[in-house]
Amino acid sequence: MNVSHPAVHPVGVPPALGGHAVPPRMRMRVRMEYLVFQGMPLPGTLGGLVLRLGQFCSALIAFSVMLSVRDFSVTAFCYLVAATVLQCLWSLAMAVIDVYALLVKRSLRNPLLVSIFVVGDGVTATLTFAAACASAGVIVLIGNDIAMCKDNPCANYEAAIIMAFLSWFMVSISFILTFWLLATL
């Protein structure tokens, strides 16, 4: 009966540097933390607060412009209003948390808390992007294909869509950086 026998090879321990052995995983973690935390707009920092306020303001402007239009009965426009309201609420709540963290000088680098930020940013980014794309498609249909911009306030719709895309862009930056932070925790 031919059976292979496993060979056991001892694993060598790397030599200690200066009397202290630093495992390779810890050396990598230190390098990743250095790459992540150097001035990036993360939760609980001034840059993160500015990014959240930018998200909030652009979503609020998009919402306000859509409310100024008398009739937005198209489903995509209703979806844009709902998505911008959700984006406003999420960004405002995250801005309040950032202000709290800055005032009491607390770190928001708890893995559970950061994972909630990642999921919330991902969901709101997806919803805002979908709403902005759907509304942009309707505007292309109204403006270019059936030429009904004389009867509709296309400029207002376009301004709201631009602000929704700007809000999506800022929340996407927030999502990517927070996801990167989660990977290093």
From Swiss-Prot:
Membrane topology of this protein: Multi-pass membrane protein
UniProt topological domain (Cytoplasmic) ranges: 1-45, 98-121, 182-185
Protein's cellular compartments: Cell membrane
Sequence similarity: Belongs to the Casparian strip membrane proteins (CASP) family.
GO cellular component, one term: plasma membrane
Assembly, per entry: Homodimer and heterodimers.
The protein's name: CASP-like protein 5A1
InterPro entries: CASP_dom (IPR006702), CASPL-5 (IPR045009)
Sorted UniProt keywords: Cell membrane, Membrane, Transmembrane, Transmembrane helix
